[in-house]
């Protein structure tokens, strides 16, 4: 690869800014953008280029960093819904250590907008007193009032929602035909990871159609509701299979790197934790996709007159409320 940024989808302005920053980087960067915009991928790509800069074997450092297995790349991520005291302590300890190999250490803090007061305080402390060899890359979906001071210590990098055409183009580079790429991009909720996962799932469009037809499948009887719910929940459960296959491939690739560089268990525990979180998130994403499909069908019904505008509007409000509750 020419550089790690070549794998980033869209975000040309952010990529250009970070690529220019590799030679003489600022002390800390805060990447802010919507969920699905590729925040983690861009942050890891930037870290990979920082660690590969002016090294004798840059491709090895780049490859290790992109696999999130470089000894001088610490990724701080939560295991649960928010950061715990133990994670704040690991950040404190890492903030003052020296690089293992080379003259740069990168600390990547993911989803800083989900940090509690203890973690925010620890982050501020390490940001204000870092050794010159340590660089910070933070990601957030929003800059909350609690993050105002942290944001003031960082160079801001804003990401936009991924354009549908960028998603279509990316899926085509992965070997997906244009018609399927466009159909998947339209139901992926502007999420790169979601689009790639759905593209590998042969039943994805079938699930979308079943959700879209849910309103017409219900005839007012409890039996119809039970049948529809059972079938849709079965499809949601089956949707995890493509993700599990991808996760197996990621573990195999990491093990190959570990064998190549003589590091047993290289980053494996962290990857397994992330995999568990991805599986939990998948169910939420599937239900949100279903709500979107149902909402689109209701909107079409209001437009063509098959659904009363007043009752249809109430249904849409209820769907939006449920979706917002699910996202929390």
What is each stretch, according to the model?
Residues 1-49, 53-66, 96, 132-133, ...:
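Charged, glycine-rich active-site and insertion segments that engage polyanionic ligands
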Residues 31, 109-110:
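Hydrophobic residues in beta-strands of the RecA-like P-loop NTPase core, especially within AAA+ ATPase
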Residues 101-106, 131-137:
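Loop/turn-to-beta-strand initiation segments
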